[in-house]
Amino acid sequence: MSAQTGTDLFKIADLFAYQVFDSRGFPTVACVVKLASGHTGEAMVPSGASTGEKEAIELRDGDPKAYFGKGVSQAVQNVNQTIAPKLIGLNATDQAAIDALMIQLDGTPNKAKLGANAILAVSLAVAKAAASAQKTSLFKYLANQVMGLNKTEFILTVPMLNVINGGAHADNNIDFQEFMIMPLGANSMHQALKMASETFHALQKLLKQRGLNTNKGDEGGFAPNLKLAEEALDLMVEAIKAAGYQPGSDIAIALDVAASEFYDDTTKRYVFKKGIKAKILDEKEWSLTTAQMIAYLKKLTEQYPIISIEDGLSEHDWEGMETLTKTLGQHIQIVGDDLYCTNPAIAEKGVAHKATNSILIKLNQIGTLTETIKAINIAKDANWSQVISHRSGETEDTTIADLAVAACTGQIKTGSMSRSERIAKYNRLLQIELELGNNAKYLGWNTFKNIKPQKA
């Protein structure tokens, strides 16, 4: 028998999927890829709660007698019976070809047949196996082999840490989904997370002093009942100061409004539903037109050290998003999430219309590593910032940390300073910083290339 060649060692020898659980206790898909060399890669996919309508389809069984319809046995079966036979024997380093083959096998525009959760699990596991076989870190493999960047120096990511949860991510009466802190005054990942941890615990102390609950939402942030966004922002500013930092200089604030969640398609108005249901808002006053919503967001940026606003308007309100970006985009990062759903074609439309100046990147919105990288590159070519993101239903998989560093996106949002599925990503970023040493750069305020932030 002849010895295996170097190329043969990268061939996929085995591939299988199985069911695991996400951070909300619902099933999700895991995949293991084994190569001829004996190296393996394993990936687990996340799941979102507030999902954009244009996202690739997360395949669920729909059987009400099993996991209330949220089982993933069909997605697992699709990997084991449909995808695996076609991929075994292929070279794991040919990521683009493998992803293209899975897209072809699915044959639908939104991966509805095999499921984006099935396809993504395989896509990520293949990359991890290939990195392992090349005896290199995943971020280096992605940067130099998959993206062809040939890099030795990397940009570490400024984290957006979700310290107050609302919207679809918490059982409280806050309509905005995420209130985040960005430690922009730090000079390293280690210092950034120190600042974030201290602010997080200062906020917890403040909430207790005010008699507000400190229960956590899906992403590890606190989920108190508050009357308005302003109350959450006041608490954040006070917590930043209590931790010994300067709001708007050391630490700035980022919002994920997730406005699609309270946009009424019939009336074309933004109805602050959770607050109204709790009878803390006047229904007439808090049913806002697009112009009123933009004015409200502008007012918030004038009153608080806000540097970034995600999904400030509905994913259906393209004209409004263009106006929002024209109004605030010179000094504020305007991020599109539901608007684009990490879809390269939709991202290109956004660039043409100047709908935002930044894009949120979620692997499971599009369903393959190759398409995700394409969306990142479209944003880079347009001089937009890119924010790599987790989902509210997460696992201990840390791929997004490696992807953020590999693509030098400069920003990541992956939850608060609690819940181990969130902390796992931050710990991975610390490992990467340690591995890179002097070849790692934390940009802080310089992460914003296309806006002129107004620092305090």
Swiss-Prot record:
PROSITE patterns under this entry?
ENOLASE
**Which residues does the record give as (2R)-2-phosphoglycerate binding sites?**
177, 362, 391-392, 413
Residues annotated to bind Mg(2+): 256, 310, 337
Q: How is the cofactor bound?
A: Binds a second Mg(2+) ion via substrate during catalysis.
Compartments it resides in: Cytoplasm; Secreted; Cell surface
* Top-level taxon of the source organism: Bacteria
- Principal subcellular localisation of the protein: cytoplasm
* Alphabetized UniProt keyword annotations: Cytoplasm, Glycolysis, Lyase, Magnesium, Metal-binding, Secreted
Q: Which residues form the active site?
A: 219, 362
Q: Which family does it belong to?
A: Belongs to the enolase family.
Record-given protein name: Enolase
What is the species of this protein? Mycoplasma pneumoniae (strain ATCC 29342 / M129 / Subtype 1) (Mycoplasmoides pneumoniae)
Q: Which gene encodes it?
A: eno
